[in-house]
Regions:
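C-terminal target-recognition/interaction regions appended to catalytic cores
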Residues: 1-155
Length: 155
C-alpha cells in the first residue's frame, strides 16, 4: 500500500513494513441507509436536508435521528469516536460519496491514533467497542510524558 497523501499524522500511525491492514471490513447497511449515505456524502448534507429531494429517506423518527447521520469531512477534524460506535455507526459516514458506507473499525482506530499494525480481536461489534472505549494512544503517550515529568522532576 503506497499512499502519496501521507502527512505527519499518518506517518506516526503507519510504521514502516507494517504488512497487512486488519479490521478494515465494511459493515452491512440496509438499502435506505445506503441511499442516505449517497445523498448526504455527495452534498455534505445533514439528514434534514434530504426532506427536499428524498422525503422517503427521512427517518420515521426525525427528532430522535436528526443528528444521527453525520458525514465526516476530509478537511475538518473527525467527530469524537464514541464508546457506542458499534450501535451509532451512522454518526461516522465515510466522506467519499462513491463509497456509501460508515467507518470501518480500522478507520475509527485511525481517528483514535491506533497504529495501522495494531490488530483488534473478537467480533466486529467487540472491535468497535474496543476502539470506542479506548484512550487514544497518542493522547495516552502525551499524558504519560507529563506524569513522568512531574514524578521525576528534579528538586
Amino acid at each position: 500500500f503506497i499512499n502519496r497523501n501521507s502527512n505527519e499524522y499518518t506517518k506516526k500511525i503507519r510504521r514502516k513494513n507494517y504488512g497487512k491492514l486488519f479490521n478494515h471490513v465494511v459493515r452491512n447497511h440496509n438499502d435506505d441507509d445506503i441511499q442516505r449515505f449517497r445523498h448526504l456524502s455527495a452534498k455534505g448534507w445533514e439528514l434534514r436536508d434530504l426532506q427536499k429531494i428524498r422525503p422517503d429517506l427521512i427517518h420515521h423518527d426525525p427528532q430522535h435521528f436528526k443528528n444521527r447521520y453525520t458525514v465526516q469531512q476530509w478537511k475538518n477534524p473527525a467527530k469524537t469516536i464514541l464508546s457506542h460506535i458499534h450501535k451509532d455507526g451512522n454518526l461516522f459516514i465515510h466522506p467519499d460519496p462513491k463509497q456509501h458506507r460508515t467507518f470501518t473499525v480500522r478507520e475509527a482506530a485511525r481517528v483514535q491514533s491506533f497504529p495501522d499494525d495494531f490488530r483488534f480481536c473478537g467480533s466486529r461489534t467487540s472491535q468497535y467497542i474496543q476502539v470506542g472505549n479506548a484512550v487514544p494512544p497518542l493522547l495516552a503517550y502525551e499524558i504519560a510524558k507529563c506524569i513522568k515529568n512531574v514524578v521525576f522532576k528534579k528538586k
